[in-house]
Amino acid sequence: LQNLLDATNLSKSSLYKVFGSKQQLFEMAIERYSNILYKSMSAELDAKPSGLAFIHDTLLFVAREIERSEEPRGCFISNSINEWSIRDQRLKQIIIDRSETFEALFAKAIKRAQDEGDLSSENNPRELAGFLFNSISGLRASVKSKVSKQKLDKIVDITLSALH
């Protein structure tokens, strides 16, 4: 918050007046963050040579956060789910909706991998996407806990194996 106040040269009360309230500002931040992330990930999926390559690279990107930051912060959406889902029903629904959008993107990648013959088509892509989204959330928690690179790599390998 302080970075935002410094960048805008506003006080807290002025910032909240511009956006309606602290709650509305937070909701707008989640929407903006998730829209930007979704567009980026969707473009990544389109650019990858296969659906499985997208899934693999996404898992590795999450696992490698430990190498990019001394204090990994995780994902804004995942952190918000953990922090707010019990306390605020409206925010909980916004976060669930955003999560489902990402699950749909993963389902698209899984379906593509199935069509390409890289994953078995026995399983429902949407159900596998829920598993993958949950696995990524757990992987992010492991990264934040500073689990070793070797253990993170093993989690990635097992997650990929489970999708087959």
Sequence positions of predicted segments:
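Helix-turn-helix
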Residues: 1-24, 28
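Hydrophobic alpha-helical connector segments
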Residues: 28, 42-73, 125-132
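Short, basic, alpha-helical segments at the C-terminal edge of helix-turn-helix-like DNA-binding modules
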Residues: 31-38
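Amphipathic alpha-helical packing segments from all-alpha helical-bundle domains
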Residues: 53, 89-115, 126-130
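Amphipathic alpha-helical segments used for helix-helix packing
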Residues: 54, 69-90
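C-terminal peripheral helix-coil segments that are non-catalytic and often amphipathic
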Residues: 57-65, 100-116, 135, 142-164
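Hydrophobic alpha-helical segments that form the core
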Residues: 78, 122-142, 158-162
